Amino acid sequence: MNPFKMRPERTGDLFVDWEKFWVKPYNKNEVNPYTRTRIILMNGTEFENVWFSHQFSRSVGDDELRRKLAYIRKSEQQQQKILTHLKPADESALEHTIGYEQLAVDLTAHLAKRVNDKNIKSALDFALLEDFDHLYRYADYLDFTTGEHAEKLVGGYTEITPGRPTISHHRHPYDSIRYPMTDKCPATMDVLAANVITAAEQQTMNYYMNTAALWPDEMGRRLYQEIGMVEEQHVTQYGSLLKPCMSRLENLLVHQYVECWLYWSCYETETDTRIRGIWQFMFEQE
């Protein structure tokens, strides 16, 4: 797949009507676990693109550029809303959290196997041990509070096992800063991986920031609060890997390229025919 060689949709077709805007949620008892993680991943990717676009727009005085950013951003917002509403109302926040941590473990491990930059691989390997711990602790909390086994939610695809103990996760903020990519032309896979994992971990961080206060018991609130602080460290670590000398426009191009790659990847691997159609539609938009 090379989005630079594919004919794009006309920009007038980027917006969808209200009927197409509304989507039926997946069935939480039947959904493939990786369908859930794909939805979480792309939700976070769209969130990152929307807020990057907002920050870009606020930092430039070119009104024509700001209009184009606003135009694309509305489409990104529609995509994000569609993805958000694929989650069913009867899937609890804790069940959904298991999906977040399954994504963290499997995505981090997958990217670590594919990157070329040893510094990026080291960052991924380091955080992976903490992602395993987070999945294990949330699974334990799910079993304790509801009797539900997280192994069913992850479909047996992801091992639920202790990782680095959470007490060892808390570090001084300075220690979360890694060396950024400084090569003039870093490997495309390295650029993609660093941007993908930053957006994914940022989505997890934001989810925990807003979920912690929902829990009626102190144990749950403390759990989300503590792991949420670790996610801040992960986002700081991954964000520090990004190439700092890129212009805003270059970064905008990378953000759009990341979306193309991920939507294509989701389409290629999706097993749910209806959801696969959504990935195809959004890939064509990108």
Regions from the language model: what does each represent?
Residues 1-286:
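Non-heme di-metal
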